[in-house]
């Protein structure tokens, strides 16, 4: 909270922010004094806050209401004790004339300004002032000048008197103020002279404190000041000097204006001073300007201009600064929340605001470099499918659900990855969008890391800077907690709430430190809770994974919940599980902050689990989408190529319609028939058709041509017969359908192979494999595809090929293959081949059937190929497995399984491919299958297809003209050759396909090779080609083109069998295994990869198929080659004559091979050797169709019935018809592609999660907080229980959940930013909405947490969670960039295999080649691993260094603290007295003195020092103690405390959190006996032991005596903290031994004594240790007197009236025992509990008190936890009145404690009640009051230290003398108010050990002024409670020994006091202290500044620090009763209080 931070500010600042200071004295109108914001009574003295500095003039001390003597400025400053003179640029005039008004100037500038304003009228005065300033006699000059100015001012001010005579109140107040003003001004001047000396005008200006808020004011007078100022005298006739003086005075006044606000005066006084100074400044500035105006010199004009400009500039600067503070978003809102709910809740909002800044910074580069350019560069009518939605989408784009799903307009917007393109938009203008996209994303992630780390480092620094906060937590809070600039009631209310909450936080910290965490029950609970939490986390992760895996099934249910199951579930999990975690966390019993952190960590793990489950399941889905995507790509490319070819061929056909028709009928048909033929040939020689791809394409073509070619073995020329045009057309079709592979091969291959193969195969295989098979197999393999295919096939067969394409298309939609299949199916329909086409698989199967026969021979060799193939085309086989099975079944008989499989496979593979493609028919399917097998293969397939097309198609495709030409007969020839060569020379595509080209892209090569193998059937190749990326394909194509050309040449030239074989072998294909066609294929394949691979590819296409298709596939490879070379033939040949095939292949006589293939049986050598001639038979087309059609039903035969009308169509019609189909297919592909962009879909999912989460974060609070609050608020009145207090209550703000929601939300944004750049903008809107909504909910419906705790100051815990989240969220993005293949149809990286490839290639291209190798080396593991090791070592080193520096820092801090202590001691050191040192000698001397002085028992050694010496010592120690406390150096701030806190909270928590009693060490010291203390520091010396023994004896004697001995025991030995500790240790030791015995007695006594001591202490805030000492010294006397006085106590009651003076003591008491002190402290807050036996002791004490009220008072002190003096003799001591050195004014105690002057009996009652009251009072309100009171007292003490000490000593003296009797009586009578007894010493001092335990008693060794004079003191001692801690202020006690006054430190109460030297009479305290050491110390220290004995126990444990002050009379009975020290604790239950 601010409170905590403010203390960190220099003590000089009273907690005002600079901004406020800027705004404070309204600078805007410096000329006109304005009324102040707060109006306070000027007359009313105001205490300075701890942080303020008092500048006192000697005479003015009264003005402050402080009685401190301000003899000199230095003294006054010292007295203030808050700021050192150098902290302020202005020094308040120390000695000032009273006339001047003992002003303590706050800011010289301000004061002067006001002062001068007051003097506005008199320049002369100002001059005088200047003069005076110049003179070093500041006080006099100032006074004179001020006086003069005032006199001169009359016109300006009411008074002529001291310059500030404008007291609004007027009259004396004015005079006082004026005096103060003049004094302040003079002080300022003096300070300036002394500190700065008067330097030249410029110099002085520059010397001004740069930080001063009024810099501008001073600067305004940027006048040249020459030494003249200082030198000029009086008005100085010299105008220049006057000007300079005026400048100087103006500057000084401005400085006064600046620093006034730091003063502790009443606000009215400050305002008046400021107004006067401003008036002066305004007037004199105006005068100067007038003077300048009269002067015409350039210099004056320039000066005038400068003045004007300076004023304007200052004004503008300040206005700007004020305006900027308003611009900080939500600052005021957050401050308001902080004041009501604590820093923990506010930390959420500051964190949210910081996150918003980070998001803005992330959004800027994204918008500037990615979103903006692409959006603005996109034209309105963009045709790019990435930027334009399809018609179906456009129709629903405006629906709400469409927006909710981020579809429609949002999907086609720059928000998502898919919108960006490297080919359209800004890229067309030369902007490298992919590079910009990638680099911006990297920049965003780097910035996120850097911003988070910078913030963490900054927070660490800040928390280090505030480390001193842990020194005096409570004083800082109390003294500097208020903001004096507050001018609004509501704000003041907030501030009060904030201060209270701050105290609660600090107290909680203290309480938590006392907890014992080692408890088996707690440990077990924690273990159980953690097990449960882990189980819940595992369940949530499993739920998300399960949901994502089934999301597709769920999406089929068309309802909102099913579609959004994933994000709804994630939101619900993140909503409910944290609640469960929170409930479980309650069982763990952690500190609220620790519990919060655990909760945060658990929720963090939960969110990360859910997020990661989501990401990984998405990645699996993405992987599953990849194959269909590649199929679609292949199909798309095939169709695109076909479209291109169709267009060109249509043009060609139109040009040559007649020929074309004929050809179309015959050659074309032949060509097509080759494809189509397959069906027909399927009947005849299915072999031709075997090339499914070709068949498919051809069938399509045939459908168009309506005729099929019959393959007959003939010379190779025959192949040429196929008209080039038809071939071209076919090839084009094939290209379009498949990547044009089919056309080239098909015409040749189909006719050749299919004729033979098809018929046989069709019937046999086809039924199974083809339509039938397709249905059968496909259904199995490709249920959807097959079904489609089958249906298509059937319809196609019966209907038209068109249908089939459509159907196919549908299937392909499922997977691309189907579309291909459709084409093929269509082909099949058109011809019998349709079967092949539609189910190329089928056709192949037909081929297989034939091939089975033929292949039977060949199949086996093929089988090997196939087998090889199959592995490659695993996918296909899997896909086609069904088909293969069917085929196998059908074919098996024919071939060996292998052969049959091979044949079947060929067909099947196409089907499979189709299947994989879903419909890719033979060609498409097959290719797809191959592709399918491996994505790369797909790509390869695609390439292959391309090659296929390429040959015919590439020529046609690539070279449409060529294709067209080839369409002519030459083309047909080429195509035929290609078909045969196609295997080799499907080249164009094959090129892509070709092994060599393939090798380029290994995956593609594999695919391509597979494709080649399978592709020989063009389909496969097409497929393969398609699979290969277009880029690759095209490259391949291009390369292929040459290759194709080569291939074509080869086809034309026809490779020799040897060449083919060689090629095939190169491929590693089973050339031999496969027939020649296979070989050809193989050869071709081999180029690709392997003959086997080819086979495999085929096989791949139809993985299983490959088996079946071995021949086909093999043959596919060969056959494919054949198919392309001679499709069917190849298949069969492969199977049946690998050798033959090889031979043919060399020729790559597609037709021959095909014909051979066609005649499945003949393939062996003949088919391959002979070229097949294709005879176009239209009727057969029917057969073909029939066979195809039937083939689904009846294998092949339906081809007859199937005659397609297509056959009758002219080639042109067919092409046009096909064109429509292709266009439709392409459209369907595009439709399918719209949902296939995985990057966009991932971005959409994350966007939905974020938006849904945002909605939940609004809806949930509305229901959970708002509606509940309404219900509770308005229904509570009529409810049967109190809903506000019990259930359901008002909601509180769940910090952990809300913080984690923010972090999780930001993690999702980071994860999605790469896939959805627009996500940041959505998140920004969400964050702003959440800020407003959440802050409204918090302020409206929430209540602060019951347990308020401080947020870690740095909030680094939140940031570390954020950093972890950032790191974890970058990992999936990195994975996607490096490992996942980007979608090929969307996004800027669609052309690359991997997104990372892009950046690699870009880098390589940008760098010269010479650097490539070094780069490769640098990025290799040989460099990276050593680098990582090096970094790890560096990190280790830095971590070690940090640890060492932290330790050094700690040591330095300790050293500083010690030095500070020493300085303070010197400052407060009384010149005559030398500070007591903890050395053994000093201790010895002190003990000796104590024993001699106070103990009648040990009068042995007369004190070496006179009573005066003792007094001096006591005084000295008291002063040092006061200093410590004032500066908060005391116990709370002890090093140990700081250390603890630092180590614990370091950067995360505020050091201020710890309470003073945190320091166990100190507490321990207090609790320790003297010997123990000595041992801590050194080895106890013999002297120590002797002294201790004497003390013990003395104590025992005192206990026994009960009178003087107690005095002796109490006899304060002045000790510094260390000594006190030693005493405590000794005391404890003694306590353990004799104390136990004495304890009871002591308990009785100590309660009384303690009661008295606290009051006594309270007066001095434990700093009255001297009093305690005095008490101790005179304890014995007091005891005697007490016994006597018990009766007299009632008289003491009158002393109570002095309570006002003694309030401090009472306060302490109140803190210690609220009873006595309640008046001051609002007793209710602090309960005094006897630690050991609080109630019993109280009771005991009470009884004892009854006899001796003071004793009872002691008892209450005992409760205070003052060590109960173990003076069993206390009773005796009580009997002995002599030692009663101090007796607290029991009355005051009573008054303060609520138990007013209760008699002994009453006291007994009251005391307990006091305790109770204190418990009640413990509520922070009282503590704060007490604290405030005490702090004020403290400040007074610090200021008036000497006076107070003197007074206190006097009081102690009085108390000792006068109060002996009174105290005794008062103690017994007033026991209720025992706290009042200032004379702690009164408590029968225990033997030295007691003293030691009382350590604070050390301070004053008062010669026991046994005289009853002390009685008076009882009242005076009370002074602490009502009075500021100036106990001494009670002069009535002057009789008390001054030393005793010092002694009175409420040692018992304030551990600090105990620490400090001074007689502390808490004998009992030793043990209790030991127990309570920590708590007491820190607690007491908390209030120690001014609250002597109050122990604040957050835990509320009895171990409060409140040890009874030294038993006053030492009613020994209560204490004595129990030998063990009874600790009376004041327990302040803050929580209880709050509840109350």
Swiss-Prot record:
Residue numbers on the Cytoplasmic membrane side: 1-353, 419-432, 548-567, 621-1308, 1380-1423
Protein name: Transmembrane channel-like protein
Gene Ontology cellular-component terms listed: dendrite; plasma membrane
Basic and acidic residues composition-biased segments: 125-134, 216-225, 1538-1566, 1614-1640, 1658-1668, 1727-1743, 1777-1793
Protein's organism: Drosophila melanogaster
Transmembrane segments: 354-374, 396-418, 433-453, 527-547, 568-588, 600-620, 1309-1329, 1359-1379, 1424-1444
Entry-linked InterPro entries: TMC, TMC_dom
Principal cellular location given in the protein's record: membrane
């Amino acid at each position: 909270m601010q409170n905590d931070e403010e203390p960190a500010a220099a003590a000089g600042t009273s907690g005002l922010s600079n901004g406020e200071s800027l705004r404070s004295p309204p600078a805007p109108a410096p000329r006109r004094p304005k009324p102040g914001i707060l109006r306070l009574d000027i007359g009313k003295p105001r205490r300075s806050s701890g942080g303020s500095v008092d500048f006192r003039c000697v005479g003015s001390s009264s003005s402050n209401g402080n009685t401190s003597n301000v003899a000199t400025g230095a003294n006054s400053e010292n007295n203030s004790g808050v700021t050192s003179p150098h902290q302020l640029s202005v020094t308040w005039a120390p000695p000032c004339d009273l006339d001047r008004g003992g002003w303590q100037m706050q800011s010289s500038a301000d004061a002067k300004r006001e002062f001068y304003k007051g003097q506005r009228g008199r320049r002369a005065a100002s001059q005088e002032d200047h003069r005076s300033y110049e003179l070093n006699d500041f006080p006099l000059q100032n006074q004179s000048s001020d006086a003069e100015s005032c006199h001169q001012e009359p016109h300006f001010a009411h008074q002529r008197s001291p310059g500030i005579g404008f007291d609004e109140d007027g009259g004396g107040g004015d005079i006082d103020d004026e005096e103060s003003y003049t004094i302040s001004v003079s002080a300022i001047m003096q300070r300036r002279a002394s500190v700065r000396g008067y330097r030249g005008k410029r110099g002085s200006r520059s010397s001004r404190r740069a930080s001063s808020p009024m810099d501008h004011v001073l600067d305004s007078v940027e006048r040249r000041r020459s030494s003249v100022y200082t030198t000029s005298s009086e008005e100085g006739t010299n105008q220049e000097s006057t000007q300079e003086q005026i400048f100087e005075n103006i500057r000084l006044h401005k400085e006064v204006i600046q620093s006034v606000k730091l003063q502790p005066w009443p606000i009215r006084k400050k305002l008046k001073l400021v107004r006067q100074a401003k008036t002066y400044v305004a007037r004199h500035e105006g005068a100067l300007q007038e003077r300048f105006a009269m002067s015409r010199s350039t210099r004056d004009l320039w000066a005038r201009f400068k003045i004007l400009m300076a004023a304007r500039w200052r004004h503008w600067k300040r206005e700007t600064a004020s305006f900027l503070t308003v611009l900080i978003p939500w600052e005021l809102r957050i401050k308001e929340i902080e004041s009501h709910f604590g820093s923990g809740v506010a930390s959420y909002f500051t964190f949210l605001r910081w996150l918003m800044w980070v998001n803005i910074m992330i959004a800027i580069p994204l918008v500037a470099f990615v979103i903006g350019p692409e959006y603005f560069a996109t034209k309105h009518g963009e045709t790019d499918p990435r930027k334009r939605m399809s018609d179906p989408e456009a129709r629903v784009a405006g629906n709400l659900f469409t927006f909710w799903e981020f579809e429609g307009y949002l999907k086609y917007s720059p928000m998502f990855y898919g919108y960006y393109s490297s080919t359209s938009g800004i890229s067309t203008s030369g902007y490298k969008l992919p590079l910009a996209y990638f680099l911006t994303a990297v920049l965003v992630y780097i910035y996120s890391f850097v911003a988070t780390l910078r913030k963490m480092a900054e927070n660490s620094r800040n928390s280090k800077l505030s480390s001193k906060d842990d020194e005096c937590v409570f004083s800082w809070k109390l003294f500097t907690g208020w903001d004096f600039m507050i001018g609004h009631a509501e704000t003041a209310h907030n501030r009060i709430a904030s201060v209270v909450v701050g105290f609660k936080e600090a107290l909680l910290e203290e309480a938590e430190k006392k907890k014992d965490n080692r408890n088996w029950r707690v440990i077990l609970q924690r273990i159980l809770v953690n097990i449960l939490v882990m189980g819940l986390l595992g369940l949530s992760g499993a739920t998300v994974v399960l949901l994502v895996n089934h999301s597709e099934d769920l999406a089929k249910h068309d309802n909102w919940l099913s579609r959004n199951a994933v994000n709804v579930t994630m939101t619900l999990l993140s909503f409910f599980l944290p609640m469960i975690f929170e409930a479980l966390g309650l069982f763990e019993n952690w500190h609220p902050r620790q519990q919060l952190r655990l909760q945060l960590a658990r929720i963090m793990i939960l969110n990360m689990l859910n997020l990661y489950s989501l990401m990984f399941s998405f990645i699996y889905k993405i992987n599953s989408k990849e194959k269909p995507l590649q199929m679609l790509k292949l199909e798309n490319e095939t169709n695109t190529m076909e479209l291109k070819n169709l267009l060109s061929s249509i043009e060609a056909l139109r040009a040559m319609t007649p020929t074309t028709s004929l050809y179309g009928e015959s050659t074309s048909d032949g060509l097509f028939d080759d494809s189509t033929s397959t069906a027909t040939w399927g009947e005849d020689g299915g072999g031709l058709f075997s090339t499914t791809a070709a068949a498919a394409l051809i069938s399509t073509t045939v459908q168009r041509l309506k005729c099929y070619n019959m393959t007959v073995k003939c010379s190779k020329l025959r192949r040429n017969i196929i008209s080039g045009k038809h071939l071209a057309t076919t090839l084009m079709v094939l290209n379009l359908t498949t990547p044009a592979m089919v056309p080239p091969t098909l015409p040749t291959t189909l006719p050749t192979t299919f004729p033979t193969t098809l018929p046989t195969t069709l019937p046999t295989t086809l039924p199974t494999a083809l339509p039938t098979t397709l249905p059968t197999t496909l259904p199995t393999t490709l249920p959807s595809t097959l079904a489609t295919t089958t249906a298509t096939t059937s319809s196609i067969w019966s209907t038209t090929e068109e249908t089939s394409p459509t159907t196919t298309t549908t299937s392909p939609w499922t997977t691309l293959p189907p579309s291909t299949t459709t084409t093929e199916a269509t082909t099949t329909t058109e011809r019998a081949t349709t079967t092949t086409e539609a189910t190329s698989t089928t056709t192949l199967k037909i081929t297989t059937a034939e091939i089975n026969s033929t292949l039977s021979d060949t199949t086996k060799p093929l089988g090997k190929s196939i087998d090889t193939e199959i592995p490659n085309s695993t996918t296909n086989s899997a896909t086609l497995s069904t088909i293969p099975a069917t085929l196998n079944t059908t074919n098996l008989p024919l071939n060996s399984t292998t052969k049959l499989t091979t044949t079947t496979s060929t067909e099947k593979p196409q089907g499979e491919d189709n299947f994989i493609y879903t419909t890719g028919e033979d060609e498409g399917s097959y290719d797809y299958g191959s592709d399918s097998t491996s994505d790369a293969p797909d790509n390869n397939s695609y390439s292959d297809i391309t090659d296929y097309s390429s040959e015919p198609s590439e020529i046609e495709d690539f070279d449409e003209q060529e294709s067209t030409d080839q369409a002519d007969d030459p083309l047909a020839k080429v195509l035929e050759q290609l078909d045969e060569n196609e295997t080799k020379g499907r080249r164009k595509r094959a090129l892509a396909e070709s092994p060599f080209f393939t090798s380029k892209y290994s995956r593609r090569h594999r695919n391509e090779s597979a494709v080649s193998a399978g592709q020989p059937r063009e389909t496969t190749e097409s497929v393969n080609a398609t699979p290969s990326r277009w880029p690759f394909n095209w490259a391949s194509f291009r390369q292929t083109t040459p290759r194709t050309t080569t291939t074509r040449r080869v086809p034309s030239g026809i490779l020799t069998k040897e060449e083919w074989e060689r090629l095939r072998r190169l491929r590693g294909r089973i050339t031999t295994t496969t027939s020649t066609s296979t070989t050809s294929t193989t050869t071709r394949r081999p180029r690709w990869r392997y003959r086997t691979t080819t086979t495999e590819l085929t096989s791949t296409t139809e993985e299983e198929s490959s088996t079946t298709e071995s021949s086909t596939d093999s043959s596919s490879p060969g056959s494919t080659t054949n198919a392309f070379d001679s499709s069917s033939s190849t298949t069969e040949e492969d199977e049946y004559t690998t050798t033959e095939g090889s031979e043919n292949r060399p020729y790559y006589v597609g037709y021959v091979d095909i014909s051979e293939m066609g005649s499945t049986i003949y393939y062996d050598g003949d088919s391959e050797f002979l070229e097949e001639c294709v005879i176009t038979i239209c009727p057969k087309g029917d057969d073909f169709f029939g066979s195809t059609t039937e083939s689904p039903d009846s294998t092949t035969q339906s081809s007859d019935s199937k005659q397609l009308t297509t056959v009758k169509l002219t080639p042109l019609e067919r092409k046009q018809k096909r064109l429509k189909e292709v266009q439709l297919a392409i459209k369907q592909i595009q439709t399918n592609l719209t949902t296939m962009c995985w990057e966009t879909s991932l971005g959409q999912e994350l966007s939905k999660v974020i938006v849904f989460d945002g909605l939940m974060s609004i809806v949930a609070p509305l229901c959970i907080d708002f509606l509940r609050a309404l219900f509770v608020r308005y229904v509570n009145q009529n409810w049967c229980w109190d809903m506000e207090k019990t259930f359901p209550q008002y909601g509180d703000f769940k910090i952990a959940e809300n913080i984690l929601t923010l972090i999780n939300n930001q993690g999702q944004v980071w994860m999605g930013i790469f896939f959805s750049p627009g996500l940041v903008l959505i998140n920004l809107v969400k964050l702003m909405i959440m800020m407003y909504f959440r802050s409204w909910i918090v302020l409206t419906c929430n209540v602060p947490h019951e347990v308020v705790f401080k947020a870690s100051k740095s909030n680094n815990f939140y940031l570390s969670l954020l950093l972890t989240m950032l790191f974890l969220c970058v990992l999936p993005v990195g994975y996607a960039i490096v490992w996942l293949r980007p979608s090929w149809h969307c996004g800027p990286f669609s052309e690359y295999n991997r997104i990372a490839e892009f950046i690699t290639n870009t880098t390589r291209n940008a760098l010269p080649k010479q650097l490539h190798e070094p780069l490769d080396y640098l990025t290799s593991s040989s460099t990276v691993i050593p680098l990582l090791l090096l970094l790890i070592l560096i990190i280790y080193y830095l971590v070690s260094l940090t640890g060492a520096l932290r330790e050094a820092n700690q040591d330095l801090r300790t050293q500083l603290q010690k030095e500070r202590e020493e300085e303070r001691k010197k400052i407060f050191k009384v010149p005559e007295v030398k500070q007591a040192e903890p050395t053994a000698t000093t201790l010895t001397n002190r003990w000796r003195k104590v024993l001699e002085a106070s103990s009648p028992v040990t009068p042995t050694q007369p004190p070496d020092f006179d009573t005066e010496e003792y007094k001096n010592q006591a005084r000295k120690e008291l002063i040092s103690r006061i200093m410590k406390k004032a500066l908060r150096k005391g116990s709370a701030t002890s090093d140990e405390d700081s250390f603890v806190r630092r180590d614990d909270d370091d950067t995360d928590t505020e050091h201020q959190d710890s309470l003073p009693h945190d320091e166990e060490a100190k507490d321990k010291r207090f609790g320790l006996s003297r010997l123990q203390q000595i041992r801590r520091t050194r080895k106890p010396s013999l002297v120590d032991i002797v002294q201790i023994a004497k003390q013990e004896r003395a104590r025992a004697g005192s206990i026994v005596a009960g009178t003087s001995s107690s005095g002796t025991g109490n006899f304060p030995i002045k000790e510094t903290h260390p000594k006190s500790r030693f005493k405590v240790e000794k005391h404890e030791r003694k306590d353990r031994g004799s104390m136990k015995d004495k304890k009871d007695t002591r308990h009785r006594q100590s309660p009384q004594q303690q009661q008295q001591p606290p009051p006594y202490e309270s007066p001095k805030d434990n700093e009255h240790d001297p009093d305690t000492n005095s008490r101790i010294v005179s304890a014995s006397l007091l005891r005697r007197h007490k016994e006597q006085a018990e009766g007299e106590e009632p008289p003491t009651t009158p002393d109570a009236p002095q309570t006002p003076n003694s309030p401090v003591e009472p306060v302490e008491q109140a803190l210690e025992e609220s009873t006595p002190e309640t008046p001051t402290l609002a007793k209710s807050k602090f309960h005094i509990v006897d630690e050991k036996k609080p109630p019993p002791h109280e009771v005991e004490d009470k009884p004892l008190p009854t006899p001796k009220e003071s004793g009872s008072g002691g008892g209450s002190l005992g409760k205070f936890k003052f060590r109960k003096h173990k003076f069993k003799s206390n009773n005796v001591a009580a009997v002995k009145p002599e030692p009663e050195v101090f007796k607290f004014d029991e009355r005051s105690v009573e008054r303060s404690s609520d138990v007013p002057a209760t008699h002994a009996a009453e006291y007994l009652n009251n005391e307990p009640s006091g305790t109770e009251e204190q418990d009640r009072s413990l509520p922070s309100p009282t503590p704060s009051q007490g604290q405030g009171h005490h702090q004020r007292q403290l400040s007074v003490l610090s200021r008036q230290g000497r006076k107070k000490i003197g007074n206190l000593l006097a009081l102690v003296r009085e108390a000792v003398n006068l109060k002996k009797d009174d105290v005794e009586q008062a103690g017994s009578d007033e026991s209720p108010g025992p706290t009042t007894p200032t004379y702690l010493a009164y408590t029968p001092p225990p033997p030295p050990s007691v003293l030691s335990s009382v350590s604070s008693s050390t301070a004053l060794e008062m010669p026991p002024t046994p005289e009853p004079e002390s009685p008076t003191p009882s009242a005076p001692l009370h002074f602490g409670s009502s009075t500021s801690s100036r106990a001494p202020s009670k002069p009535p006690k002057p009789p008390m020994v001054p030393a005793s006054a010092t002694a009175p430190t409420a040692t018992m109460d304030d551990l600090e006091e105990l620490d400090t030297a001074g007689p502390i009479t808490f004998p009992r305290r030793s043990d209790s202290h030991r127990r309570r050491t920590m708590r007491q110390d820190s607690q007491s220290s908390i209030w120690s500044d001014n609250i002597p004995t109050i122990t604040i126990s957050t835990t509320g444990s009895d171990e409060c620090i409140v040890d009874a002050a030294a038993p006053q009379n030492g009613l020994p009975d209560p204490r004595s009763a129990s030998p063990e020290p009874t600790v009376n604790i004041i327990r302040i239950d803050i929580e209880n209080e709050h509840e109350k």
